[in-house]
Curated annotation (Swiss-Prot):
Keyword annotations: Ribonucleoprotein, Ribosomal protein, RNA-binding, rRNA-binding
Protein name as annotated: Large ribosomal subunit protein bL20
Gene Ontology cellular component annotations, sorted alphabetically: ribonucleoprotein complex; ribosome
GO molecular function: rRNA binding; structural constituent of ribosome
């Protein structure tokens, strides 16, 4: 008896077409173009999960730098002062303090400045 493969290929095609839902034109309707678009989107997604970490770190450093400069310190001097003071807060928390809790950040900046001198 011959092997009929319609079910297997239909499932495989459906997997890609479901993943291409929301794409425009033939990219969501035609199997071959949908597969190419989906596989490319998976590559971009993989790459950008790494890029996202870099982007957030850059944003946090930018915010900490802005907060530190409001208190007369550069980013590097502020971070070095915190290290000398034995304060080990990560950049995400420091950036959040700089934006939302300005008084607490000012205290940290004052402490960092005192440890530098």
């Amino acid at each position: 008896m011959r092997v009929k493969r319609g079910l297997a290929s239909h499932r495989r095609h459906k997997k890609y077409l479901d993943a291409a839902k929301g794409f425009r034109g033939g990219r969501s309707k035609l199997y071959r173009t949908a597969r190419e678009a989906v596989e490319r989107s998976w590559m971009y997604a993989f790459r950008d999960r790494k890029v996202k970490k870099r982007e957030f770190r850059k944003l946090w450093i930018l915010r900490i730098n802005a907060g530190a400069r409001m208190h007369g310190l550069s980013y590097s001097k502020f971070m070095h002062g915190l290290t000398l003071a034995g304060i080990s807060l990560n950049r995400k928390v420091l950036a959040d303090l700089a934006v939302r809790e300005k008084e607490d950040f000012a205290k940290l900046a004052q402490l960092a400045a005192s440890k530098l001198n």
